[in-house]
Design a protein with these regions (language model features):
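Active-site rim/loop-helix segments in enzyme catalytic domains that contact anionic ligands
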Residues: 1-113, 140, 144, 248
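Metal-dependent de-N-acetylase/amidase catalytic core
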Residues: 2-13, 91, 95-259
């Protein structure tokens, strides 16, 4: 598959579940697009208020508000100033009214008129249910309101999975034994290898979300962390037909499905 160029993406709309999803999976893409003068808009479904393993340092009662502030600072480091927060409670996306959530995304799409929508694939990268649900919402909204726009799913490549398997086993970040995905190179529509100033910029953006990243950086070391976050990869979504699209439609409608 021929690789896409950043400028070919046009106006970019990212749709994610929690603050920091957008930075981990697409900070380089967003920064490059903004540097090229393109419009980039970010949508986050929740404030991530349940996202801490250290409640002493990051009190849960204040975490949602803190993560909202962190997300703005992180996006600002990438040149992104347009951020929509849907306000769902962290961990409850699968229990929300899917039709209403999709309607909200349709309204945002109608306003932004993106050329490219970026979100999780149906696997949710880590298998998190919020990630998988938001993928389904974004896919359904794309079909309704922006069928002519490109839909990109964030993914992990076989090379990335191989290189970092020991770290992934140590961190235990994947909630599904079939993850991470091992997308072959020929199926990758866009891969960004960040180095130099661009890698530094992504590191700054992630460090701005200290409630999520400070502990991890301290655990594995900044240089290793910087290398780990330096790959971003995306596949073109199958936007019509096929078992994968059927699974997405079932999840968007609230019907349980195994992906």
């Amino acid at each position: 598959m021929a690789q896409l160029s950043i400028t070919a993406l046009g106006t970019v709309l990212g749709v994610w579940a929690h603050p920091d999803d957008e930075a981990y999976l697409s900070a380089g893409l967003m920064a490059l697009a903004r540097d090229a003068g393109q419009r980039v808009v970010c949508v986050t479904a929740t404030r991530g208020e349940h996202g801490t393993a250290d409640p002493t340092t990051w009190p849960p009662g204040r975490l949602g508000r803190l993560r909202e502030v962190e997300a703005r600072a992180s996006l600002s480091a990438l040149g992104v100033t347009e951020h929509h927060l849907l306000g769902y409670v962290d961990g409850t996306c699968g229990a929300q009214d899917a039709a209403a959530a999709i309607d909200r995304l349709v309204d945002i799409i109608a306003d932004v008129r993106p050329d490219t929508i970026v979100t999780f694939g149906p696997d949710g990268i880590t298998g998190h249910d919020d990630h998988r649900t938001v993928s389904a919402w974004a896919t359904a909204a794309h079909r309704r309101a922006a069928a002519d726009a490109r839909l990109l799913y964030a993914t992990t490549t076989a090379a990335f999975a191989d290189r970092w398997q020991d770290l992934h086993d140590r961190l235990d970040i994947y909630l599904d034994p079939d993850l991470p995905l091992r997308t072959p190179a020929e199926d990758v529509a866009l891969e960004i290898q960040l180095d130099g100033a661009l890698a530094d910029r992504k590191l700054v953006a992630l460090r701005a979300q200290a409630s999520q990243t400070a502990g991890l950086v301290a655990t594995i070391g900044e240089q290793r962390y910087r290398a780990w976050i330096a790959t971003e990869a995306f596949t073109l979504a199958p936007t019509s037909g096929g078992a994968l699209q059927t699974a997405v439609e079932h999840r968007a409608s609230g019907t349980p499905v195994t992906l």
